[in-house]
Amino acid sequence: MVRGLYGGAHQRLEMQIQKRVVGPVVVLDVSGRLVLSDPGSDAQFKDCVAELLESGTESVIVNVANVTDIDTSGLSALVSAHISMARTSKRLKLIAPTPRMRHLLHVSRLDAVFDVCATEEEALAGFGST
């Protein structure tokens, strides 16, 4: 347990990735922390995307609604995944970023790089998979 700023206790959630398939699209539900201080979280994410590429997955949605914290290492992992997908003419979309993540994407100008959607339905429609 970690004490919060206001004395409340909360747990530090390590990153977890749940994979599910919606038609031809793989959805990665990412939760917890995607930060450098959590050893291996960025590598775990990169490995997951590499496995999808090796398996021939064409379209990936990364649901970041439950990412509780992200830093430059986490952003770097997302950028690396995007680049890996784009190099092989595959597509990656982010859905449901928190207000803080939206702000980080904006100030780093990554909002111009990623296709960011509010909902899974919107992202699937963009892939033509509704």
What are these regions (language model features)?
Residues M1-V21, G128-T130:
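Non-catalytic signal-transmission and effector/linker regions of two-component phosphorelay proteins
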Residues Q18-R20, I95, C117:
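General small-molecule cofactor/ligand-binding pocket signal
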Residues D115-T119, A123:
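Short acidic-hydrophobic, aromatic-tinged amphipathic segments that line or gate anion-handling sites
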